């Protein structure tokens, strides 16, 4: 069963500003924030390290939006919005992933993240 579908915005260094803007607009709270420099083995420069790897904005305990920055210059203007589909079980997630993978392009393989 799908628990939620959440818009996931990707930016080229503007995720912090967008997160602050939507936090104010929707009177929401930041419930999760990770930066590139926090990842194991990070070897980028300080500017890249301060970019948002993943952030969650929620209201009334429900996720509104997810945010992230890319590595500088790697943002494709046509791919700035994705949908994160949250399943109630891992088995349902894997089943959907396998079926979608048959005709789609896997950008990120199944892995533990946030």
What are these regions (language model features)?
Residues 3-5, 63:
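Short, well-ordered coil/turn segments that N-cap beta-strands
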Residues 1, 11-12, 87:
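Alpha-helical interaction segments
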Residues 59-63, 71-114:
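Vicinal oxygen chelate
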Residues 3, 51-53, 79-81:
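Residues that flank catalytic or metal-binding motifs in active/ligand-binding sites
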Residues 7-9, 83:
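A structural signal for short, well-ordered beta-strand segments
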Residues 9-62:
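Core segments of cupin and vicinal oxygen chelate
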